[in-house]
A protein has these predicted regions:
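Short strand-turn-strand beta-turns centered on an Asx-Gly dipeptide
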Residues: 27-29
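A short alpha-helical cap/connector motif
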Residues: 2-7, 123, 168, 193-194
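The AdoMet/dcAdoMet-binding core of the Class I SAM-like
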Residues: 10, 21, 33-182, 186-188
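N-terminal auxiliary segments of SAM/dcSAM-dependent transferases
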Residues: 1-23
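Conserved S-adenosyl-L-methionine
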Residues: 189-200
Length: 200
C-alpha cells in the first residue's frame, strides 16, 4: 500500500502495488487504472473518438484523474484541452506514483484544468465549443445517472458533428451497465458506436 487516504471531496483514494498489474489507482474500493495496461485503455479511448471525427481543435475531458486521456489528447495534437476533474488530489497522487501515465499533462500550455463539479462548470461554457468530449467517469450506476441527467448540457457545448466518447465499463462483468449507457446515448443521438478493447 503506497497511499491510503480520504480526499477533501470525500473520495477514498488508494495506490496499491499489485503483483500482476503494477501500481494501480483505486477510488472507493474500485480499481480505476493499472500501470500495466493503462496505455491500451487511454489510446483506444481517444482513438475511438478520432476515428469518427478527425478534428482536433478543442477537447473537453470529464473526469480522467489519472491523466491518461489528457496525455493522449496532447499526443494527438489537440490545440486546446479543458480538463474538468472533481478531485485535484486524485491528479496529485497519480502524478506522484503513476507519473508515466499523465506525463505532467497539467503543466502543458494546451491544458486548462477546471477543478470541481464538471457538470456545474460546463454550464458557463459557450454552445458549440468542443470537437470532442471524453467522459471518463467511474463505471457505476451513479455516474451513468449523472451523465444522463446532464447529457443535454454536453450536447449543447458539442460542435455540430462533434463526438462524445464515454467509458462504459465491462460488457462481460457488467452487461446491464453497458446497456444503460447505450440507452442514454441512443436517447440523445441518432447514432451510437460501441468500441471494445480487452483489458486484463
Amino acid at each position: 500500500v503506497l497511499e491510503d487516504f480520504k480526499s477533501k471531496v470525500g473520495q477514498h483514494i488508494e495506490i496499491l502495488e499489485l503483483e500482476q498489474f503494477g501500481k494501480s489507482l483505486f477510488i472507493d474500493g474500485e480499481i480505476q487504472v493499472a500501470a500495466s495496461d493503462e496505455h491500451l485503455y487511454s489510446s483506444t479511448f481517444v482513438g475511438a473518438g478520432l476515428k469518427l471525427n478527425k478534428k482536433n481543435e478543442r477537447a473537453a475531458i470529464i473526469g480522467g484523474g489519472d491523466g491518461g486521456v489528457a496525455r493522449e489528447c496532447i499526443s494527438k495534437k489537440f490545440n486546446f484541452i479543458d480538463w474538468y476533474e472533481l478531485d485535484p488530489e486524485v491528479v496529485e497522487v497519480c502524478n506522484k506514483h503513476l507519473g508515466d501515465i499523465g506525463k505532467k499533462a497539467t503543466e502543458k500550455n494546451s491544458v486548462k484544468c477546471v477543478w470541481g463539479d464538471a457538470f456545474e462548470s460546463i454550464k458557463s461554457v459557450s454552445e458549440d465549443t468542443y470537437d470532442h468530449i471524453f467522459v471518463d467517469l467511474n463505471d457505476d450506476q451513479f455516474c451513468i445517472d449523472l451523465a444522463a441527467k446532464n447529457m443535454e448540457s454536453l450536447v449543447r457545448i458539442l460542435k455540430p458533428k462533434g463526438v462524445i466518447t464515454a467509458q462504459v465499463g465491462s460488457q462481460d462483468k457488467k452487461p446491464h451497465q453497458v446497456e444503460n449507457w447505450l440507452n442514454v446515448f441512443h436517447h440523445h443521438f441518432g447514432n451510437t458506436k460501441l468500441s471494445r478493447v480487452y483489458i486484463p
